[in-house]
Amino acid sequence: MSVREDRLMAEYETMKKWRSRVVEWRAIGNSKSPDKYEVTYHVKSIIGFDNGRPLTHTGFKVIIEFSGDYPRVKPDVHLDSQRPWPIHPNIWPDGRFCLEGDQHWIPGVGVPMDAICQMIGEILSYQEVNIRSAANGNAAMIDWVKKNLVFETGSNTKVKNPIDPSPIRLPDIDDSVKWGTDDQEPPQQRIVFG
């Protein structure tokens, strides 16, 4: 078995143990070592602005794909083609994510799949915002984020509030309910991933 297949199997085993009340995922490809995942986040994120006020939407599907060069190269992480897409300083206009782990990717070692999913969730729910190296320079969004979400301490930027103005909420655990459908929205409280 190749190093790639070993790592993909390990990533899949990690995902089978990972749980979140606001995330659904499915593996695509080889049943023991899948190289693609669809991960749906049932969180509220900003999709635009109306007179300086954020417009939000809940429910985003993210595709995580491992190339033939994995684990030497990081996986491709992007939103699927279904719109609306969230706008965020750390999501490129073409839907690719600029993850914190990108700067720390060590060829052959990488970042575990559950940590990647955690980072994506924190970005979508505006719990993680890096405006210093913004992938998306949308001026209205950056201005709103600076005024409402972040404060700076020395060289660091910290999130002071998730999305406008109250924290994001988690659904109660109820396997019979599919959160994020058009007619249901989760009750509000801070999201914990994993």
Segments and roles (model prediction):
Residues 1-59, 69-194:
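UBC/E2-like fold recognition across ubiquitin and ubiquitin-like conjugation systems
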